[in-house]
Amino acid sequence: MKKLLPGYTWHRGVAGKKLFLTFDDGPIPEVTPFVLEQLANYNARATFFCVGDNLEKHSDIAQQVLASGHKLANHTYNHLKGWQTSFDEYLQNVQQCQDILATIVSPTTENKPLFRPPYGRITTKQATALRPTYELIMWDVLTNDYDATLSPEECLKQSIAKTQSGSIIVFHDSLKAERNMRYALPRFLEHFTHQGYTFELL
C-alpha cells in the first residue's frame, strides 16, 4: 500500500528509540480524558487527529489535550470517506475542520498542519489538492482497537509486534474502540517505556 500511495507520511525516520502515538476520531468526554491520564503516566506525547464536529462539541477537552502538551490535527469535520465524497465536498469538509482548529490552536509557521484521511481513504485528486497545504499522515501500525471481533489481549499483542522505532501508531479515542483501547494503551505504553522508547509529537 505504501508503494501505491507515495507522498504520504507512513513513519518517521528517527535516530534512537522514538515512537509516534496518534489518536483518531475524538475528542469525546467518555474516552479522551482516560487517554490523557495514561499518556501523563508515562510522560508520553501524542498527536490527536480530531473530527471537527467533536472539536466544536467538546472544545474544553481539546484545550485539555493542548494543555497536556499534545498536538491537535485535522481528520475532516464529519469523518468522511474520500472515495465516497465529491472533490469539492471533501475539501470543504477538511477546511471546515481546519477553521475550528484555528480557533483553538495558536498559529505556527514552522511546519504544515497535519491531516489524516478517515479510514485512510482519499482519492488521488483530493490528496493532490491538499498536499501543498497539509502533511498527509498515514501510519505503519494500525492497532485495530475498533474491531469488536478482536480481543483486547490480541489487540495489544499485534500492536506490539508491528511496532518499531519511528512507527506511527493509530489508536482511537472513540466509543467504538474504547474496550480494546482501555486495555491495550496502558500496557503498550508500559512495554515500550521499559524498553527505553520515548513517545514524541509528529
Where are these regions (language model features)?
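Active-site beta->alpha N-cap acidic-glycine motif
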Residues: M1-W83, E89, Q96, I100-T103, ...
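Domain-start "cap" segments at the beginnings of catalytic or binding domains
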Residues: D99-I137
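Catalytic grooves of carbohydrate-active enzymes
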Residues: T163-L202
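Short histidine/acidic/glycine/proline-rich micro-motifs that form metal-
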Residues: C50-L55, N78-K81, R121, L142-D145, ...
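His/Asp/Glu-enriched short active-site or ligand-binding loop at hydrolase and phosphoryl-transfer sites
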Residues: R121, Q126-I160, G196-L202
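Alpha-helical scaffolding segments of alpha/beta enzyme cores, especially the outer helices
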Residues: F34-E37, D60, Q64-A67, Q92, ...
